Design a protein with these regions (language model features):
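Aromatic-anchored, charged helix-turn/loop surface patch used as a conserved interaction hotspot
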Residues: 2-12, 69-134
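Acidic, glycine/proline-rich low-complexity segments that act as flexible tails and inter-domain linkers
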Residues: 2-4, 8, 26, 33, ...
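Short terminal or interdomain "cap/linker" segment that borders an active site or interface and mediates
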Residues: 11-24, 171, 178
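Charged, terminal alpha-helix-loop-beta segments
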Residues: 20-22, 46, 159, 174
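Short amphipathic alpha-helical segments and their helix-coil junctions
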Residues: 22-44, 110
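Conserved active-site and cofactor/substrate-binding residues in soluble primary-metabolism enzymes
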Residues: 30, 50, 125
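N-terminal interaction modules that seed assembly of large macromolecular complexes
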Residues: 35-80
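A charged, amphipathic interaction segment
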Residues: 97-177
Length: 186
């Protein structure tokens, strides 16, 4: 039976300790004030991938490594097929089941929970793919940039427009992310 843990804690990757830590880190980001609402709005408006933001912030804020625009583009290409063929359809199905469930169809509650579990597990898989891809990349000193610029680059890649997000909003979200308290076991 699938674990239906609402937080995603049940989907840890035992064979990859860093991926497990990145997943927990992402759960912590999600709880920061305004991060969830902003990320969901960006997801709806621009096709923004929250797992990709978690990856960018993990690389920049936790690993303290730089990621350049070309690397952002290559990383996005690495997972775009997975995102489009697995994550997005799972998300669409979950949203549909939730909407149907809200119309007094309690038998869909279990279906909704299963679809949410599939979506979370698929997002975890994407994070693992991104982390493994990053580990395989040659790191070039001086090539990278800060988190704000990496997120801007990603937004311009997925939305085909570099200035869709208000600068203040971007700075605020990236500032929250950059200052998250990390667990001592990293």
């Amino acid at each position: 039976m699938v674990s239906l843990d609402k937080t995603g804690e049940g989907f840890l990757v035992e064979q990859d300790n860093e991926a497990t830590k990145m997943w927990r880190y992402g759960l912590g980001l999600w709880k920061l004030p305004g991060v969830k609402d902003t990320c969901l709005a960006w997801q709806l408006k621009f096709g923004f991938d929250v797992s990709f933001l978690i990856f960018l912030s993990w690389v920049g804020c936790v690993r303290r490594e730089s990621i350049g625009r070309d690397q952002v583009q290559r990383a996005n290409a690495e997972v775009s097929e997975w995102r489009e063929t697995v994550i997005e359809p799972a998300r669409t199905a979950r949203k549909y089941a939730k909407a149907e469930n809200s119309e007094a169809k309690p038998e869909l509650t279990h279906v909704f929970e299963l679809l949410r579990a599939v979506e979370l597990r698929s997002e975890l898989r994407e994070q693992v793919m991104l982390l493994r891809w990053w580990r395989s990349q040659e790191k070039i000193a001086g090539e990278g940039q800060g988190l704000v610029q990496s997120v801007k680059d990603y937004l311009s890649i997925v939305s085909h427009s570099p200035d869709l997000v208000e600068e203040g909003e971007l700075q605020r979200i990236c500032g929250l992310i950059a200052n998250i308290e990390l667990p001592d076991d990293r």
